[in-house]
Curated annotation (Swiss-Prot):
Belongs to the nematode receptor-like protein srd family. Keywords: Membrane, Transmembrane, Transmembrane helix. Its main location: membrane. The chain crosses the membrane at residues 12-32, 42-62, 95-115, 133-153, 189-209, 243-263, 273-293. GO terms for cellular component: membrane. It is found in: Membrane. This is Serpentine receptor class delta-40. It is a multi-pass membrane protein. It comes from the Eukaryota.
Length: 320
């Protein structure tokens, strides 16, 4: 397919992706606020955190519509979205925000697993314990954000670089060039290793906590009803799928990315979808949460008149 066909496909895709993802995310946020189980406690904070960062991810993705020209050295980053009308440094900054938002939403799912395990163990949450766990799992993100700030300052904000991009984009209409990507600088290499390492490691860490949760609720020391155990199993199943989605989407497109860099092959799918595919979990995650968190699913059934209000079980029963 030619470049024009990819642009036509994305011209249709981005509005649908934005509208559908935003509606489902806002619906989920409403349910988190007003229909969460009483004992969900801080888990709903992490569900909300995941949803908010995925909204940012969707907004940035659709407003930027990046394309990576991997045949150029260094890699040329173009914007075909509304950001093309702004200065290049803003587009480059939004690219870093895109990565951070994806990183944060993925890490939030992992932290939800950790605190779910703590709840199953019936551990009391002290402020120091909560703060310690959150800081521990956010260390890679904090380090990544520091690297991204350094990259923006060094590679986008200097006056001579800004003037260079103003000249390049003076007559740009279809797209603007917003930056250059390379792994030859220390901050960019560190940032790449942090993000790619977390994408690979997070699903397996989540799976580790999944097994511990299931072993715990199936042990003789966990004195709760079969129904309650079943609800926890369903909740954990949904989290597991969410945890593995980034890995499923990232690995193929990143493999193609490295192939294009090493061989200098032009593959238009890779160029146009390199930043689209990693955003797709934001499309699927809210639907998974709406389905696998029982009170949310039942509330949706009530709205669709599939189930009557009187049939809804108390929302206090999901987590404890």
């Amino acid at each position: 397919m030619g470049a024009d066909i990819y642009r036509d496909v994305l011209y249709i895709f981005y509005p649908i992706f934005f509208i559908f993802s935003t509606i489902t995310q806002l619906m989920l946020i409403y349910l988190i606020f007003y229909h969460s189980p009483t004992h969900l406690k801080m888990l709903k904070v992490f569900l909300l955190n995941t949803s908010l960062f995925q909204i940012i991810l969707v907004v940035v993705s659709c407003s930027s519509q990046f394309r990576m020209i991997t045949t150029a050295i260094p890699i040329e980053l173009r914007s075909y979205g509304l950001l093309r009308y702004l200065e290049a440094w803003l587009g480059y900054t939004m690219y870093q925000v895109l990565q951070t938002s994806a990183f944060m939403s993925g890490m939030s799912i992992l932290i939800t697993f950790v605190f779910k395990y703590e709840l199953v163990r019936q551990i009391e949450f002290s402020k120091s314990r909560v703060t310690g766990i959150i800081l521990l799992f956010h260390m890679p993100i904090i380090a990544s954000m520091v690297m991204e700030v350094i990259m923006v300052i060094n590679q986008s904000l200097p006056n001579e670089i800004r003037e260079q991009y103003k000249f390049l984009n003076a007559n740009a209409e279809e797209y603007s060039i917003v930056g250059a990507l390379s792994l030859k600088t220390v901050p960019s290499l560190i940032n790449f290793l942090l993000i790619s390492g977390s994408v690979v490691a997070s699903p397996f860490i989540s799976f580790f906590f999944r097994e511990k949760i299931l072993r715990r609720i199936n042990s003789q020391f966990y004195q709760h009803s079969k129904w309650k155990k079943s609800q926890i199993q369903v909740f954990v199943k949904g989290l597991t799928i969410q945890a593995f989605l980034p890995l499923i989407f990232y690995v193929p497109v990143f493999g193609l990315y490295f192939y294009c860099i090493l061989t200098h092959t032009e593959i238009l799918f890779q160029q146009y979808f390199m930043t689209v595919v990693p955003c797709l979990p934001a499309f699927f995650d809210p639907m998974l949460t709406l389905y696998f968190v029982t009170p949310y699913r039942r509330r949706l059934k009530i709205w669709m008149r599939i189930e009557k209000e009187s049939k809804v079980l108390p929302v206090t029963s999901l987590v404890k």
